[in-house]
């Protein structure tokens, strides 16, 4: 499909969208991750942006996309509770890859939130969901709107959790496309890419973390645990950022 046809697909009936997306995803399945990035930047409409949590394996997508479009906005939602190592990792990769970093935060500071609501992450699933809406979902919605993003690139992978096992390479979320170039990659694929381009893992990887977010809801992988159990005290895997937008 041409760029104009892809743009028109955003407003097509759902049945048409579904049929065309199935066809496009069959095509994309035959491409490498790098080829998917090239295709997406060339054909998918609107402003492009890449979201990143600067997690354990974040350097893969940050490198892969920025090597093709150096000025692509990189959206980070900063909760104010990231690990010190994460902030250092952000600085390291931003400098090394010359990233066009765009940081978005909740309108209310973390200290003010605690004064008003208490520690929401300790208030069960409902508290976690409220915390995530305040600190991740709303800032990301604002970022996508302010940057007028028509195509959203992200580094989700099916092997990361059961909630991601059925995600397609390309989807339509509301009024924009969402492209997941490394969706079927394994941890080995990630390691090979990082090694090939001499890219670092997040510093906490060496301390046993396989997934890292906020200090209060991330912990190292222990014997018998799955990756998704290392986040949010095992209560949930997703913060909502990729599912409520």
Swiss-Prot record:
It comes from the Bacteria. It is found in: Cytoplasm. SUPFAM superfamilies: Adenine nucleotide alpha hydrolases-like. It catalyses: [thioredoxin]-disulfide + sulfite + adenosine 3',5'-bisphosphate + 2 H(+) = [thioredoxin]-dithiol + 3'-phosphoadenylyl sulfate. GO terms for molecular function: phosphoadenylyl-sulfate reductase (thioredoxin) activity. Its EC number is 1.8.4.8. The active site is at residue 239. GO terms for cellular component: cytoplasm. Keywords: Cytoplasm, Oxidoreductase. InterPro entries: PAPS/APS_Rdtase, PAPS_reduct_dom, PAPS_reductase_CysH, Rossmann-like_a/b/a_fold. It is an enzyme of class 1 (oxidoreductase). GO terms for biological process: hydrogen sulfide biosynthetic process; sulfate assimilation, phosphoadenylyl sulfate reduction by phosphoadenylyl-sulfate reductase (thioredoxin). Gene3D superfamilies: HUPs. It holds the Pfam family PAPS_reduct. Belongs to the PAPS reductase family. CysH subfamily. Catalyzes the formation of sulfite from phosphoadenosine 5'-phosphosulfate (PAPS) using thioredoxin as an electron donor. This is Phosphoadenosine 5'-phosphosulfate reductase. It comes from Shewanella oneidensis (strain ATCC 700550 / JCM 31522 / CIP 106686 / LMG 19005 / NCIMB 14063 / MR-1).
């Amino acid at each position: 499909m041409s760029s104009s046809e892809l743009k028109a697909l955003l407003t097509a009936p759902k049945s048409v969208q579904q049929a065309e997306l199935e066809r496009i995803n069959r095509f994309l399945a035959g491409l490498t991750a790098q080829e998917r990035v090239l295709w997406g930047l060339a054909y998918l409409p609107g402003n492009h942006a890449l979201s990143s949590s600067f997690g354990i394996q974040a350097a893969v997508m940050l490198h892969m996309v920025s090597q093709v479009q150096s000025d692509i906005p990189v959206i980070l939602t900063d909760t104010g509770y990231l690990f010190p190592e994460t902030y250092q990792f952000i600085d390291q990769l931003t400098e090394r890859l010359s990233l066009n970093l765009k940081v978005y935060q909740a309108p209310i500071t973390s200290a003010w939130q605690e004064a008003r609501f208490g520690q929401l992450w300790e208030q069960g699933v409902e508290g976690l969901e409220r915390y995530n809406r305040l600190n991740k979902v709303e800032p990301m919605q604002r970022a996508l709107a302010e940057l007028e993003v028509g195509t959203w690139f992200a580094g989700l992978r099916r092997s990361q959790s059961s909630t991601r096992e059925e995600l397609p390479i390309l989807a339509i979320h509301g009024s924009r496309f969402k492209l997941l170039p490394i969706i079927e990659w394994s941890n080995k694929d990630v390691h090979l890419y990082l090694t090939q381009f001499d890219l670092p893992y997040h510093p906490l990887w060496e301390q046993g973390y396989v997934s890292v977010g906020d200090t209060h809801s991330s912990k190292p992988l222990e014997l018998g645990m799955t990756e998704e159990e290392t986040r949010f005290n095992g209560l949930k895997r997703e913060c909502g950022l990729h599912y409520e937008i």
